[in-house]
A protein has these predicted regions:
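Flexible glycine/proline-rich
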Residues: 16, 30-35, 39, 44, ...
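Helix-rich terminal scaffold detector
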Residues: 1-13, 175-300, 304-310
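Structural signal for hydrophobic packing residues in well-ordered secondary-structure cores
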Residues: 20-27, 45, 107, 153-157, ...
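Short, glycine/charged-enriched hinge/interface segments at domain edges or termini
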Residues: 2-13, 31, 63-230, 369-370, ...
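Solvent-exposed alpha-helices and their adjacent loops that cap or buttress functional pockets
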Residues: 56-58, 69-72, 90-94, 107-109, ...
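Predominant activation on well-ordered alpha-helical scaffold segments within soluble catalytic domains
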Residues: 16, 20, 61, 117-118, ...
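Intrinsically disordered, low-complexity, positively charged segments
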Residues: 7-74, 350
Length: 411
């Protein structure tokens, strides 16, 4: 079969560019309650309908006084009322008057300053300033969170906890979001046995489906269907086409290398289209991208670490594009190797490593002892993917490298 790409495989950056160029965002939008919008992508801008909080409020507990010059120690006021959250003082303050005010409570008319309670003493209704106060009035502006008409979120934003909280604080109860692609996941292999079932010699418990579905769920995506199929070309072909009929994206793991039982790539060529095959990358060389039934198809390697890493590098950005957001790569930072690392040169490598911060703030990478792409446990302790160029072989302690941080934004 003719291959329109280098025999050693495509560089990762070129492969990603080809994938993204082949995709356009899914059409449409759906309105969801705010509680269901976490991780979804906004379909349109949302503006504040009113200023928030909508009134001037005390930043701390104390006493509100009229907007007179900065008071001096020994100044006195008569306490005429109280303002609490949900129970504001209804009158206006005159010079020489004060009201007790709690954090978050509205300031009364003509109230221009809050005196922190630590700076005053009160006897009956007489308030006395004990020490100098700052020029800070300790007042939250009426439009501190948002002004009426201000954009709260723009179109194409992936919504986090802070976005949802801000929208809620501005009275927004629901939002129009972009549709999410339904993912169809196909796991292939004669050797696979469901977890919990007895297995014969030479078989393994199937874990790639669990790994990928959990990873995609952590990334805010949803696997609509998950199938495990033996290495039978007819059954695999039917499963691929069935997934393409009900899902917007089809993902497989295993069967994309060049072995006698690797049927996925030839089936894709027969029943769909192969855009490219093989990556110039370790781990993750056996990788296929194309179309099946008109749907984007991602053929991930069968080794679990390679499947997870290629999913992060290529599938995750593609899903972001389909949702209508700008694909955001994992954060990158520079680190130094904490110890020598031996490897064979020839392919660029994404090596799992732990991040250690020294007492002086230096960032060190501790490479996991085994970089075998079949070793699932090496993913659990990894904080970083070290970006090792193809031309570098054995690396010395202190070698400076770029690394991808395996952490998602919190807010």
């Amino acid at each position: 079969m003719a291959e329109p790409f280098p025999a050693e495989g495509l560089p990762l950056a070129e492969a990603l560019a080809r994938v993204l160029a082949d995709l356009t965002p899914l059409e449409g939008a759906v309105r969801l309650p705010l509680a269901d919008c976490l991780g979804r992508v906004s379909a349109e801008p949302c503006q504040a309908t009113a200023s928030v909080p909508g009134f001037r409020a005390a930043i701390l507990d104390g006493y509100a006084i009229a907007g007179e010059p900065v008071p001096q120690p020994g100044d006195r006021w008569r306490v005429v009322g109280r303002s609490a959250p949900g129970a504001p003082f209804s009158g206006a303050l005159a010079p020489g008057q004060a009201i007790r005010i709690l954090t978050g409570a509205p300031l009364p008319e003509l109230g221009g300053r809050v005196l922190p309670q630590e700076l005053v003493t009160r006897e009956d209704d007489t308030l006395t300033l004990l020490r100098e106060t700052s020029a800070n009035p300790w007042i939250r502006a009426a439009d501190e969170e948002a002004a009426a008409g201000q954009e709260l979120v723009g179109a194409g934003r992936r919504l986090g906890p802070a976005d949802l909280a801000r929208l809620a604080s501005c009275g927004v109860a629901s939002l129009r979001v972009r549709p999410q692609p339904r993912l169809g996941l196909l796991i292939s292999g004669d050797e696979l046995v469901p977890p919990g079932q007895p297995r014969d010699p030479g078989t393994i418990w199937e874990s790639n489906g669990t790994l990928l579905e959990a990873l995609l769920t952590r990334l805010g995506q949803r696997v609509a269907q998950r199938r495990v199929v033996a290495d039978d070309p007819e059954a695999l072909g039917e499963a691929l086409e069935a997934l393409a009929q009900t899902c917007e994206v089809v993902v497989s793991t295993g069967g994309v290398s060049a072995g006698d039982a690797d049927w996925i790539r030839p089936l894709l060529a027969q029943r769909g289209d192969v855009a490219f095959w093989k990556l110039f990358l370790k781990p993750g060389r056996p990788f296929a991208y194309g179309r099946i039934g008109g749907r984007p198809f991602f053929g991930l390697p069968g080794n679990p670490v390679a499947a997870a890493i290629t999913a992060l590098q290529l599938l995750w950005p593609a899903l972001q594009r389909l949702e209508g957001s700008t694909p955001e790569p994992l954060p990158r930072l520079q680190v130094r190797l904490a110890a020598p690392f031996k490897r064979g040169s020839g392919r660029p490598e994404l090596a799992r490593a732990r991040l250690r911060v020294t007492a002086t703030g230096e960032l060190l990478a501790e490479v996991d002892g085994s970089q075998a792409s079949s070793r699932i446990g090496s993913l659990g302790g990894a904080d970083l993917l070290l970006e090792i160029p193809a031309e570098l072989g054995s690396l010395e302690r202190g070698q400076l490298l770029w690394a991808q941080l395996l952490r998602l934004p919190i807010f």
